[in-house]
């Protein structure tokens, strides 16, 4: 059975103008939030990079040993980025607003990125919890109601709403926001 990487090989030649945004594109951008962009300052602080530019920087850092893929959740994300960057469909999309806050004492794990599609739609992707102790602790705390990451997500949505005037779309892991 095929996966999203196969989809990028198969249909990555089609732009969003040729074939509208679909459920597989939604999944690809949801997985995009799992990229470790901590060392790439240009996707933070109000700046954006095209997926193509992001891949060039990311692959340079990967070669220098600055990118470490330690989690099973992150294992295929460098491949995903490479395939997105080489596709007509995603290469010109712009990523920005990257946030990755892991606070052990608060049991808070908050990560998000916004991808601007060619039509100006801002796709907001929130990373879910992972297989770390902080991730597990936050998962357990979810059974008690609102966790600190929920508040951070609302703040992020508000700042994105102000930064991007066009349509908004997105994916929330756990559907909590």
PLM regions and their residue ranges:
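Conserved alpha/beta-hydrolase "nucleophile elbow" surrounding the catalytic nucleophile
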Residues: 173-177
């Amino acid at each position: 059975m095929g996966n999203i990487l196969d989809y990028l090989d198969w249909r990555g030649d089609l732009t969003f103008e040729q074939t509208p945004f679909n459920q597989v594109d939604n999944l690809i951008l949801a997985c995009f939030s799992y990229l470790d962009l901590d060392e790439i300052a240009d996707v933070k602080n109000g700046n954006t990079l095209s997926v193509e530019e992001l891949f060039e920087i990311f692959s340079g850092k990967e070669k220098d040993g600055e990118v470490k893929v330690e989690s099973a959740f992150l294992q295929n994300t460098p491949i995903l980025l490479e395939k997105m960057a080489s596709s007509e469909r995603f290469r010109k999309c712009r990523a920005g607003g990257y946030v990755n806050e892991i606070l052990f004492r608060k049991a808070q794990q908050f990560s998000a990125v916004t991808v601007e599609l060619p039509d100006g739609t801002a796709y907001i992707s929130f990373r879910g919890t992972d297989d770390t102790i902080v991730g597990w602790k936050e998962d357990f705390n979810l059974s008690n109601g609102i966790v600190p990451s929920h508040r951070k997500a609302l703040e992020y949505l508000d700042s994105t709403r102000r930064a991007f005037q066009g349509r908004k779309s997105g994916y929330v892991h756990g559907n909590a926001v």
